[in-house]
Amino acid sequence: MNQKEALMKAGVLAEALPWLLKFQDCIVVIKFGGNAMVDKSLLHTFAQDVVFLRLAGLKPIVVHGGGPQITKRLEEKGIISEFKNGYRVTTGEVVGIVKDVLVNEIQKDIVNAINAMKSMAVGISGDEFDLIQVKKMMIDQTIDIGFVGNVERVDIKQIIEVLESGEIPVISSLGIDNKGQIFNVNADSAASAIAKSLRANKLVLLTDVAGLLGNYPDETTLINTLSLSELEKMIPNLDSGMRPKMESCFEAVSSGVSRAHVIDGRKPHALLVEVFTDSGTGTMITKDLE
């Protein structure tokens, strides 16, 4: 490393200092999803980011879905994936496959990636210990999409215990109803519900686009900041992929989470850029008074 490179890196560290001080002991709920889950190099850099956050004094919580891997597993079994309003139609057969992929494949990969750097990740399935309690979801009160749940309540006790032990919870987006039935839960919705229940400082959704685009797919139309009232007007016109994400951000910030962000998980270290730089990245949702 030459002197110029060293000075540039020192500048980056200096820029991070006020953010390190600001976010000490702050809870950051991170939804990890999209193609970053199937790209080993991106999984590695994501794990680095999460470990860095924890060692820097923040309290990261990872919530993950499994769209690409679930679709692949279903294809292998000859089952065609069906979606309605952005939600996967989940039959009794499919929900068992969903749990297997989420817990035994994806969660395991994330936990192992984090623990390869420092042993501090703890895997938790949302349907265990009544962690994520749900009711069956119906679209527009009439369209049945099977075993897909709306989050009713999050029992935060286990999450807090993991955080207080200095570890990182890695939570699979599953839920359970009052009859013991397991449900598939949209990972954005699960992350939002967990952030609300913990009154987190940040909710960060990693996705496969740069953020909310004014004219999709033109990334030059990226919307950097939106207030709640601005977002509320836009939600009805969003496509089925982005709408659940923005609804999750809206719900979180409306319920006391300080800020919500949608960032590009395809970019290495996007999470650190968002948290520790002045410019940030992606789209930020704030309360109307900011």
Task: Briefly describe each language-model feature range.
Residues 1-266, 273, 279, 288-290:
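Nucleotide/pyrophosphate-binding catalytic subdomain
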